[in-house]
Amino acid sequence: MSSIQNKTDVILIGAGIMSATLGSLLKELKPEWEIKVFEKLANAGEESSNEWNNAGTGHAALCELNYTAEKSDGTIDISKAVKINEQFQISRQFWAYLVSQNLISNPQDFIMPIPHMSLVQGEDNVAYLKKRFKALSNIPLFEGMEFSNDPEKLKEWIPLVMEGRTSNEPIAATKIDSGTDVNFGALTRMLFEHLKEQNVEVHYKHSVKDIKRTSDGSWSVKVQEIESGTIEYHTANFVFIGGGGGSLPLLQKTGIPESKNIGGFPVSGLFMVCNNPEVVEQHHAKVYGKAKVGAPPMSVPHLDTRYIDNKKSLLFGPFAGFSPKFLKTGSNFDLIGSVKPYNVFTMLAAGAKEMSLTKYLIQQVMLSKEKRMAELREFMPNAKSEDWDIVVAGQRVQVIKDTEAGGKGTLQFGTEVVSSADGSIAALLGASPGASTAVHVMLEVLEKCFPHHMLEWQPKIKEMIPSYGVSLAENRELFQEIHQSTAEALGLSEKELVHS
């Protein structure tokens, strides 16, 4: 096995939406920098970013009830929903910029307008949804949202969901037309085509084996060319680890202090996909329910219209599964291999704390198809087993860390950037809301890792993302202006526009 040595400015590990976004930002901000990407699979966007491996929801907290918790005094905390919506607006602005500059084209291949709806049953849940609707109605980001507890109105909105419903239990929904379905796999592939045109070297079938700091403070990345077995060493002043579930083991190899006391717990996802085109045509919305009491946030059930390969699809889920792999293409030894002397107590503490999650996962793994159909029928009473197939979605590695609020071994359900003190290396860990907030998260990487460049870069960032540094929730006119311009650039329908 021969060994090859190379030097570059930036190395991105993993050809998913995060590396694609960071690479695209850097090429606009520092076009002269040399960037190399290493991906162990044969194409971009094949793991978590792949359209079959995530829900494809443009997460803007329009319908996801886990972002609007009810406080002990009965009021609704909307702060998380506002934050996530603001972050999605940043993604929309950057995508619209790329389209307007002809850096990517055919936005309809990756983003489509689709109503986002929340659906609840039972008196308490209906009261909660009404309070949530009132709280969000005062915020520009959620303008255009409608609430109804009238079954006749709901039949107009979601005929499949209402058909065959015999219960007299109260039912209510909210609907907002400014929701989107995003094909993150298609977007990732587009961005990598754009990066190749910008002279970024993208190396597929290259597996990163080790990351070590050199004597001059840069990073040496050991890469194996999978087919030939050739070992290469590439050095760079900045390395980003965006390998989805594979990021934690690579972060551990760096040895940076920030990588200690962090663990990961893999959760796999299953969806049911409708194989009957007549049924698919009768539904046109992403309808999110409420997680059952005691179930984790990632278990929120939803019945989704999706656009995949320019074809309308209908999916229901997620159902959780368990695999010790950190990636769909990973190893059964990933989980045990990630347990180190410096994080073993963090992992054990999480195991003791999260017995309810363990119980939930065991129950989910044991579900038969008919039991899954029973859950679907809570949403869609007339669903027929023969119309639905099971699809295995992606692996997600939930972060486990020690926190002040939660103590040792606290399970985190968000997305987290871990970077070295000097900003020379950063990794992205975690899951939801993930890809929808990719641009915000990669700007966070830039702020953490290139603070000395931010003043110089600010005008260009503002050109690409006009709301950068400004709260759209507090600036109605700016939000309406940006929402309209991004809708036009991205080819979203007139219905999607927010009107004053």
Swiss-Prot record:
- By which gene is this protein encoded? mqo
> What keyword terms does UniProt attach to this protein?
FAD, Flavoprotein, Oxidoreductase, Tricarboxylic acid cycle
Q: Which family does it belong to?
A: Belongs to the MQO family.
One MF term from GO for this chain?
2-hydroxyglutarate dehydrogenase activity
InterPro entries in alphabetical order: FAD/NAD-bd_sf (IPR036188), MQO (IPR006231)
HAMAP family this protein is in? MQO
- Cofactors per UniProt? FAD
What's a Pfam family this protein contains? Mqo
Which top-level group of life is the source organism from?
A: Bacteria
Its pathway is: Carbohydrate metabolism; tricarboxylic acid cycle; oxaloacetate from (S)-malate (quinone route): step 1/1
Q: EC number(s) on record?
A: 1.1.5.4
Q: What is this protein called?
A: Probable malate:quinone oxidoreductase
Q: Which organism is it from?
A: Halalkalibacterium halodurans (strain ATCC BAA-125 / DSM 18197 / FERM 7344 / JCM 9153 / C-125)
Task: Tell me the Gene Ontology biological-process terms attached to this UniProt entry.
Answer: tricarboxylic acid cycle
Q: Which reaction does it catalyse?
A: (S)-malate + a quinone = a quinol + oxaloacetate
